[in-house]
């Protein structure tokens, strides 16, 4: 016969059954790590009508690079996917031409 358990899964440990839940139950209403509201980021290139991102314009490109030298993601910069590709291409070209560093200067 099958044993019935109330909302708990039984685990086998060294051949003995335990009646503790196997994991924390989900859906208990807790939400962690979610931002409430906040200011919406705007696309800097679209607002300033910048059509071409020049790899030699390091002052502009520095806005989209983190302190450690990584390219910032769209969710942080607020750029569109099209403009994010333009920025990434320009940053990579500037790195090859030694105008921007690949990593931070620690």
From Swiss-Prot:
Coiled coil: none annotated. One of its GO terms (cellular component) is cytosolic small ribosomal subunit. GO terms for molecular function: small ribosomal subunit rRNA binding; structural constituent of ribosome. One of its GO terms (biological process) is translation. Keywords: Ribonucleoprotein, Ribosomal protein, RNA-binding, rRNA-binding. Transmembrane segments: none annotated. Residues 1-41 are annotated as: Disordered. Belongs to the bacterial ribosomal protein bS18 family. Binds as a heterodimer with protein bS6 to the central domain of the 16S rRNA, where it helps stabilize the platform of the 30S subunit. Part of the 30S ribosomal subunit. Forms a tight heterodimer with protein bS6. NCBIfam families: S18. PANTHER family: 30S RIBOSOMAL PROTEIN S18, SMALL RIBOSOMAL SUBUNIT PROTEIN BS18M. HAMAP family: Ribosomal_bS18. This is Small ribosomal subunit protein bS18. The lineage of its organism: Bacteria, Bacillati, Bacillota, Bacilli, Lactobacillales.
